[in-house]
């Protein structure tokens, strides 16, 4: 399984430097939509990394597909918008229990 990264230039640069080969650089919402669809169809990709703000800009149906996706597993990083979650919330969603209580 491979790792794929979708995002703007400043987001994906570090992943490129780390040796990630499947990097999809986006500039607008239509390019992010096509990149996400391409990754969802590629069965060799096991993990998809995206910036939370880029996920928030996607159409609702595509966001739902990403949230429900098992393969690839979607990892959303960063973001300050309404859709961003704290680490605590992400763990609670993944595990189903609030471990900090």
Swiss-Prot record:
Keywords linked to the UniProt accession: ATP synthesis, Cell membrane, Hydrogen ion transport, Ion transport, Membrane, Transport
| GO BP term, example | proton motive force-driven plasma membrane ATP synthesis
Cite the InterPro entries for this sequence.
Answer: ATPase_V1-cplx_f_g_su (IPR008218), ATPase_V1-cplx_fsu_bac/arc (IPR022944), ATPase_V1_fsu_sf (IPR036906)
Cell membrane found in the keyword field: yes
- The UniProt record lists the keyword Ion transport: yes
- Specify the protein's topology with respect to the membrane: Peripheral membrane protein
Q: Which GO terms describe its cellular component?
A: plasma membrane
Transmembrane regions:
none
One GO molecular-function annotation for this sequence? proton-transporting ATPase activity, rotational mechanism
**Compartments, record wording:** Cell membrane
The principal localisation class reads: membrane
Which family is this protein grouped under? Answer: Belongs to the V-ATPase F subunit family.
Please explain the role this protein plays, according to its UniProt record: Component of the A-type ATP synthase that produces ATP from ADP in the presence of a proton gradient across the membrane.
Share what the entry says about its subunit structure, partners included: Has multiple subunits with at least A(3), B(3), C, D, E, F, H, I and proteolipid K(x).
Listed name of the protein: A-type ATP synthase subunit F
């Amino acid at each position: 399984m491979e790792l794929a990264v979708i995002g703007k230039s400043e987001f994906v640069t570090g992943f490129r430097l780390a040796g990630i080969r499947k990097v999809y650089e986006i500039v607008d919402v239509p390019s992010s939509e096509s990149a996400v669809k391409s990754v969802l169809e590629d069965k060799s990709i096991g993990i998809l990394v995206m910036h939370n703000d880029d996920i928030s800009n996607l159409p609702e149906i595509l966001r739902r597909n990403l949230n429900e996706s098992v393969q690839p597993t979607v990892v959303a990083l960063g973001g300050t918008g309404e859709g961003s979650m704290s680490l605590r919330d992400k763990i609670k969603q993944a595990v189903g229990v609030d471990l900090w209580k």
